[in-house]
Each structure stands twice: as C-alpha cells, then as structure tokens.
A protein has these predicted regions:
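Long, charged/polar, soluble alpha-helical segments
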Residues: 1-97
Length: 97
C-alpha cells in the first residue's frame, strides 16, 4: 500500500498522544540525564504538534512523518531509561520484564 489513509493517520496520532500521556521522567536521574529527558519530551511534544498542524493543512505525508518522529523520541527516552513507561512493550519499544 502506498497511501496514508485517514484510518492509519488517526491510529498513529492516537497512539502517540496516549504514549505521551503515559511517559513519566524517571526518578533520581543525574542532572545531565534529567536535562536530556526534558529535551526528548519537548521534542516529542513539538513533533506531535507539527503532525496535527500538517494534518489540518492537508499535508498528510509530513503529518505522518512528524507523528513517527514524535513517537521515536518517546521510544528513545524509554530505551535509554530516561522515561518510565511501566514496561509497556505495546506502546513503546522496551522489554516487558
């Protein structure tokens, strides 16, 4: 399939929105890691905002790219142990144990 369908767009916007709500910055991080965690979180929020803007403008290719970048920042934070995602390996690329 070579199309970004409305169903797929809604699915990924919803998934990333829910994932963003679930993320918590890990406790007891070093100053450096806390700064990094906040940057990752801000980048994710910014890309999600961009995705919604692009979708509203009818630019679905950039919207789909932006929502995937948004989620990638969340995954990066989870994999790096900057974010507590409650070992959710459905919404995030992490081990469940």
């Amino acid at each position: 399939m070579k199309l970004i369908t409305e169903k797929k767009m809604i699915k990924y916007l919803d998934l990333t929105t829910r994932a963003l709500k679930k993320v918590k910055i890990e406790k007891n991080l070093s100053k450096k890691d806390l700064k990094r965690a906040k940057i990752y979180l801000e980048m994710s929020k910014n890309y999600l905002s961009d995705a919604k803007h692009f979708k509203k403008e009818g630019n679905w290719v950039n919207a789909f790219a932006a929502v995937n970048y948004s989620h990638a920042w969340l995954d990066a934070g989870a994999i790096s142990n900057l974010f507590d995602v409650d070992r959710d390996n459905i919404m995030f690329t992490v081990d469940s144990d």
